[in-house]
């Protein structure tokens, strides 16, 4: 069982991470400001990761003799797939933003910075709610971007547990036919 889980977790985590890394490369190569695509990126991340999380649990369930998976194995699978996928995605972002083309990061951050300054000038009554535009410049520091890895660990545990609960209780059509 341990080998099945390890193989499935690594394979599906790397697939999810590869897709997300390719998505970021497409954003970079097209010259799009990835900050302005944050909502779209969230939807892409969530969709890809959730698909591979559920797929992993289903694959392991089918490979076991009793066609069942316990909650512990399900949470390890789903959380691990999410962690590996998001880790690969963040590694690609850091590679592009701080090694391959740091100027791209600066251009994206400057664009957001100037938009926030402009918004504060146009709507001074909301300036206190918009926050300090200088905080945006902190994204140029690699230390602030490395924190994402710790955040991904927490997210993976929480979302992994929720997915494990849903996927473990999910009735398969073949299971309900056999029971009748």
Regions found by a protein language model. Name each.
Residues 1-4, 169-180:
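Short, charged juxtamembrane terminal tails flanking transmembrane helices
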Residues 1-61:
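Transmembrane alpha-helical insertion/packing segments
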Residues 10-26, 47-48, 75-91, 150-166:
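Hydrophobic, lipid-facing residues on alpha-helical transmembrane segments of integral membrane proteins
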Residues 31-32, 97-101, 167-171:
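Short helix-capping/hinge motifs at transmembrane helix termini and TM-loop junctions
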Residues 57-73, 98:
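Membrane-helix interface/capping segments
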Residues 91-123:
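Functional transmembrane-helix hotspots
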Residues 119-134:
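Low-complexity, acidic polar-rich segments
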Residues 133-154:
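Individual transmembrane alpha-helix segments
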